[in-house]
Design a protein with these regions (language model features):
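Nucleotide-activated donor-binding/catalytic signature segment of Leloir-type glycosyltransferases, i.e.
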Residues: 93, 97-102, 271-300
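Conserved catalytic-core segment of nucleotide-activated headgroup transferases in glycan assembly
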Residues: 60-74, 213-287
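C-terminal alpha-helical cap of glycosyltransferases
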Residues: 396-411
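Catalytic binding pocket for nucleotide-activated donors in carbohydrate/polymer assembly enzymes
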Residues: 175, 191, 306-391
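Hydrophobic beta-strand scaffold residues
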Residues: 145-147, 258, 281, 339
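Active-site and donor-binding regions of nucleotide-sugar-utilizing enzymes
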Residues: 17-214, 232, 236-238, 251, ...
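Donor nucleotide-activated moiety binding/catalytic core segment of transferases
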Residues: 204, 282-324, 329
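Low-complexity, intrinsically disordered, cysteine-poor segments enriched in small/polar
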Residues: 3-17, 21
Length: 411
């Protein structure tokens, strides 16, 4: 099986190399790994103890981030070595100030794993949520380097628990401890004789509470909002935008305004959104006191401000639920916003709980969206939804401290 796995890894790398000739993201993936070991070696100039964090992309980074910053604050002698698998993580966070070194993870081969660990020499290793790389985990286990999986979620239908999944299940035993988000994940692992597990929760909750505490203010949004209510489309794709824009057409009064923060902020996508709108709109980058106040829709054409924008909102429509899975719902509910999203939310613990408690609503189409919006116009219905949304965050804080104390204080 290991030969088949290694061949699959090689084939994946070769496929990305071919794709790099015509795909920008694949090109970044390939170029970021050129001469990577010499680049890493040139940066490591001392023997200061190192903690290695590995994240697939930006979402996983946000889950690891609270723990990184806790270690930096309480254990400043440790250096943080941060790796990403995807360009969508590294390219956005390559200047992250709490990491001493930031690189792409070299392809998961036995040779690469040995060379990487020989150069980096981590004392402690954290893999975040869904990252399972056999050769790295096996080498870490053989070298007896403490390795932890944090903010993970497990389901019965995952390959680890299939009759043919023994090779992948073996990776779970390479971790010294697994911190899961919920009791269900723990029970699945225990049923499969993986006993080195505990429920810590989702570290992202601690992160969004920190964002709420230190939220940024934007004069442009204040001018834009005035005395209206704002419906925010967060990390939207065309499917959500079509629903939102259709609803905008029905709002002829001055009660509502709208913020659209698309997942893709390329010029092509921004123009596409503007073309669909038949109302006065303004991009954030071009906003001023005059045109903000006059606009019905503001389009966010940058990355990084959405998490603070939710403070101005009343309701949030979250993108991704009609595609591969919803984007961040924790950021809006921290500010007490009820959230609406598409059908594909089941892999996200917080979304499941929000639907159960009435703080979040899943929709299949425009008619269902319209029904939820009409329901939320009722003050009692809205206040109940807002309270339930905010309760989830307050109830589930503290995962970062649980993990930190377990590893560094032996609690």
């Amino acid at each position: 099986m290991i030969r088949l796995y290694d061949f699959g890894i090689w084939l994946y790398g070769f496929g990305l190399w071919l794709a790099s000739f015509f795909d920008k993201k694949a090109k970044l993936w390939v170029l970021g790994r050129q001469d990577i070991f010499s680049n890493i070696s040139s940066q490591i100039t001392d023997n200061q103890p190192t903690v290695w964090f590995h994240c697939a992309s930006l979402g996983e980074f946000e889950q690891g981030r609270p723990l990184i910053e806790k270690i930096k604050k309480d254990l400043p002698d440790y250096k943080i070595f941060l790796t990403f698998f995807s360009p969508s993580g590294l390219e956005i966070r390559k200047n992250y100030k709490y990491a001493d070194h930031i690189f792409y993870l070299p392809l998961d081969t036995t040779k690469n794993a040995k060379q990487f660990l020989k150069i980096v020499q981590p004392q402690i290793v954290f893999f975040v949520k869904y990252e399972f790389w056999y050769n790295y985990l096996k080498q870490l286990n053989q070298e007896k380097i403490p390795t932890y999986l944090v903010s993970s979620i497990f389901r019965e239908d995952q390959i680890f628990f299939k009759p043919y999944g023994s090779f992948f299940k073996k990776m779970l035993f390479f971790f010294d401890h697994i911190f899961v988000q919920n009791e269900y994940s723990k029970s699945i692992l225990l049923e499969n004789k993986v006993s080195h597990v505990s429920v810590a929760g989702d570290t992202r909750v601690d992160r969004v509470l920190e964002i709420q505490k230190n939220k940024r203010s934007f004069d442009e949004i204040i001018f834009f909002k005035g005395n209206t209510e704002i419906l925010i489309g967060g990390s939207t794709w065309p499917s959500e935008e079509d629903i939102l824009i259709k609803w905008i057409y029905t709002q002829n009064d001055l009660h509502w305004k709208f913020i659209i923060a698309p997942h893709d902020i390329s010029e092509h996508r921004l123009l596409e959104i503007e073309k669909k709108l038949n109302v006065n709109s303004v991009r954030f980058s071009k906003a001023n006191a005059l045109n903000s106040a006059a606009a019905k829709v503001m389009i966010i054409d940058n990355i990084g401000m959405l998490s603070s924008l939710y403070q101005y909102g009343k309701i949030a429509l979250i993108g991704g639920g009609f595609g591969n899975g919803i984007h961040n719902t924790l950021e809006p509910i921290t500010f007490g916003l009820p959230v609406i999203f598409g059908e594909k939310y089941q892999k996200f613990e917080e979304a499941n709980k929000l639907v159960e408690t009435g703080g979040g609503y899943s929709i299949k189409n425009y008619d269902e969206f319209n029904y939820i919006m009409k329901s939320l116009e009722n003050d009692d219905f809205y206040n109940n939804a807002s309270t339930n949304a905010e309760k989830y965050v307050l109830k589930n804080q503290g995962a970062t401290m649980k993990i930190f104390d377990f590893i560094f204080k032996g609690k």
